[in-house]
A protein has these predicted regions:
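Secreted, disulfide-rich extracellular signaling modules
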Residues: 2-490
Length: 490
């Protein structure tokens, strides 16, 4: 009963056929997508009002019972900002530094990096005197936000507490108990394009610990667990001073530097020996858990109810909540009249961005937003989904347009229909009811594409980069134009 009733309310099979099939049987008609041309004529009317009946289509070429009636509706989504308590991410990217924005507030970022063990590790060459000369924490970055002329300071600590196996950002303070100071560096961000590196000098004792273990305890390099239990759990990098610049870090390494005697042959064939320098690195990888901490101070102010604006920020900032109540959904999609069936053809969502009205704002809108049901948020990132693998519920916006200042979701009709199909209940008399509101969330994401095909998404991740967008609202709402088609049932 439920399946047949839902099928009569939402026929989702009218797709991709031409108008020259219009005189075929009613069964063929239900399987065709000849409606596209007719529906397109009414797209402009979709956002202008509610329940606007349009002229019927096909009256002169079809039996009366088969006449098609395009219909324009507007769904009113209540919109406001909500906290993103933590963000899930599998990458090696993090942020380091402190940034102030007059609209979005202060943002500070620090992190704990773990390092991949090297099985059966030994130094490639024998260090002179059996000594590691220097040890560094190397922070590699290609981008930064803010003022590159600001002097900042980063301090490195060795973490002594066992770290959780979690890819969610959060408070790292509980894991800093007993942490020991290793070193610090004062720096300014590099202005030139390309890869930049910070080299934080740390205690040579850390490098010697690795060297001695390679000689005396090779079992410490047998597994990641043994490595962290006996040698190094992680390094905490903390932004201590300097406000105005934040680095986008893509790699963190522990570097051991030592001198060794190198034998070679000169151009004349004579043997020679000289002192050379070698460096060996332990790196963080995607297989390890990176523990990020993001601190902001204006989230409570920005998420207060506002009839004109809502805010979207990253990382671990604010997302846009969109919800439409069950009563409005029922009025729009269930009351199509006796003997009629309604098809959802088009549902276009555009989010308009207003530039900040304060001077000195440094945060820019993220390139992409992801729209999906609020209850699917955690599962989506944990399972590594994309808008292709979850095409019925997840929608990626077009790239942010700096000219029109908009994010566009071209057609989210499948998302609406998926909600209706899941939550409509049909009683014994065939009467359909709906009592579950549609709750969506839009948040900043990073999109990576397939090699050789920039049109195909490979991965979608939370946006680990400072961003901010002020979304324009209409009396606390966002309106979505919906075009449907009503046709007579057999």
């Amino acid at each position: 009963m439920l399946h047949s009733a839902l099928s009569s309310i939402f026929a989702n099979g009218i797709r991709k056929r031409r108008m020259n099939q219009i005189n075929k049987s009613h069964r063929s008609l239900c399987g065709a997508k000849f409606l596209i041309g007719a529906v397109t004529l009414f797209l402009a009317l979709a956002g202008t009002g509610c329940n606007d009946n349009l002229s019927h289509v096909g009256g002169s070429v079809m039996p009366p019972k088969d006449a098609l009636y395009p219909h324009a509706d507007t769904l009113h989504f209540d919109a406001h900002s909500v906290d993103i308590d933590s963000v899930y991410d599998r990458s090696t990217y993090s942020l380091l530094g402190e940034l102030s924005d007059p609209l979005y507030g202060n943002l500070r970022a620090s992190y704990i990096s773990r390092f991949q063990y090297a099985r059966d590790y030994h130094t490639e060459f024998e260090p002179i005197g059996g000594a590691i000369d220097s040890t560094f924490i190397e922070v590699s970055y290609a981008k930064w936000v803010g003022d590159s002329t600001v002097w900042s300071k980063v301090t490195a600590y060795e973490v002594k507490q066992k770290l959780p196996e979690s890819r969610y950002s959060g408070d790292v303070q509980p894991y800093l108990k007993g942490a020991s100071y290793l070193g610090a560096l004062t720096y300014r961000a590099g202005n030139a394009t390309g890869v930049h590196k910070l080299r934080i000098p740390v205690s040579k004792e850390l490098g010697m610990r690795f060297y001695k273990a390679s000689k005396e305890h090779p079992e410490y390099f047998a597994s990641q667990e043994a490595f962290e239990e006996n040698l190094l759990r992680g390094i905490y990098l903390h932004s201590t001073t300097g406000n105005g610049c934040m680095l986008s870090v893509y790699s963190t390494s522990l570097v051991l530097s030592y001198r060794y005697q190198k034998s070679d042959t000169t151009r004349t064939g004579a043997d020679t020996t000289y002192i050379a320098t070698a460096e060996e690195s332990f790196v963080n990888t995607k297989q390890l858990y990176l523990h990020r901490q993001f601190e902001t101070d204006r989230g409570d102010v920005l998420k207060k109810p506002n009839s004109d604006y809502a805010f979207i920020t990253s990382p671990q900032g604010l997302a846009l909540s969109l919800s439409v109540n069950a009563d409005e959904l029922s009025k729009t999609f269930l009351k199509q009249g006796s003997g009629n069936t309604r098809l959802i053809n088009e549902a276009a969502l555009t989010l308009a961005v207003d530039p900040p009205d304060v001077r000195g704002s440094v945060l820019q809108p993220a390139t992409y937003l992801l729209l999906l049901p609020a209850d699917s948020l955690g599962h989506f990132f944990e399972m590594g989904e994309t808008e292709r693998s979850q095409s019925n519920i997840a929608f990626l916006s077009s790239a942010y347009n700096i000219t029109s200042r908009t994010y566009v979701f071209a057609n989210i009709s499948r998302l609406i229909q998926a909600h209706l199909t899941k939550h409509i209940h049909v009683n014994d008399k065939g009467v359909a009811t709906l009592d579950e509101p549609l709750k969506l969330i839009a948040l900043p994401v990073t999109r990576e594409t397939m090699s050789g095909n920039r049109n195909v998404t490979a991965t979608i991740s939370n946006y680990i980069y400072p961003s901010g967008a002020r979304i324009r609202l209409n009396n606390g709402q966002v309106r979505i134009g919906v075009v449907t088609t009503i046709y007579a049932k057999d």
